[in-house]
Amino acid sequence: MKRILSFFLTLVLTAALLCPAALAVNETAAKDRDWVYITLDPGHGGDGAGGNDSGAVNEKYGYQEADLVLKIGLYLKEELETYRNVHVDMTRSDSYGTRYTPLREVKQRVDFAAEQCSDLLVSLHLNSAGSNQSVHGGLILASNGNYDPDCAKVIDAVGTNILAQLSRLGIDTSRGLVKEGSHDGTTYPNGKLADYYGIVRYGQLRHIPAMIVEHCFVSSNSDCEQFLSSDAKLRAIAQADARGIAAYYGLEKKDPGEVDVEPLFRDCRSHWAKDYVNTLYFTGVLTGSAAPRTRAGSTVWEAACSSRTARSRAPCS
């Protein structure tokens, strides 16, 4: 089927190339594969319908996890966008939240990342040990890799980089990467033990590297004083996260005034039919929406580059 479709597209492409507009394809084709799409998920917060989950709360200072991780998320988005070829989406960008952030449900957060064709989902949190003041420091909740080991490897690598950067701020990261299996025997479709944490588990099922960054303990007065007590300190945490992510993907800072040009259709930027699809779009043979995905309104597109089919069946690359 792929060979037949490729032959058909080649015929259409040959005709389309006679149009000068097709030359624009060459300007973006080489860059498309270099783009990184990241979804940030500030944990807890509003559900988009008036409900709210504050997350963990520090009894002495009154700091609420949901508020602090939102600030970290906004700072992190800002910092990541100083790098070339990075697009950042957020499950929520305010305290009210969205339909993707319902209370006590996390699947929708992963669904959102999948809809954005994300290469990485980073869920931002602060830990809590209740009244135990001796517990402090950061860790990352990663995957056991029982369903999609390739995605798990990405989590391990990005997570290790982030922890190294948080450690430079003075945060105790000795707990490292934590991989916790299901407590009740829940398994993945392949019969292997599933991950315990929903963000990580649903990420595995959607073939998206998804991790939870517990930056430090909001229940710890010491951690609050050292790392959470000002916007400058929250920004420093966000910048540490960004450096860790950038190190894994090999990101480079933009030059002053530099403007990125995103791929036409983010869901097929690494697909074998990408160049065909871009050319057909430029020449008017194929119509669609450039952000974030094409609209499957043409037989060519549905056959060549259907994101929902490709993303649901293909592991991380």
What are these language model-derived features?
Residues 3-24:
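Sec-dependent N-terminal signal peptides of Gram-positive bacterial secreted proteins and lipoproteins
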Residues 14, 41, 141, 214, ...:
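Residue-level detector of conserved, well-ordered beta-strand and adjacent loop positions
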Residues 24-38, 60-63, 67-259:
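Active-site-proximal helix/loop segments of hydrolytic enzymes
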Residues 35-62:
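Short glycine-rich His-centered loop
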Residues 47-52, 221-222, 287-289:
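Short, solvent-exposed loop/turn elements at domain surfaces
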Residues 259-316:
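Extracytoplasmic Gram-positive cell-surface binding/anchoring modules and repeats
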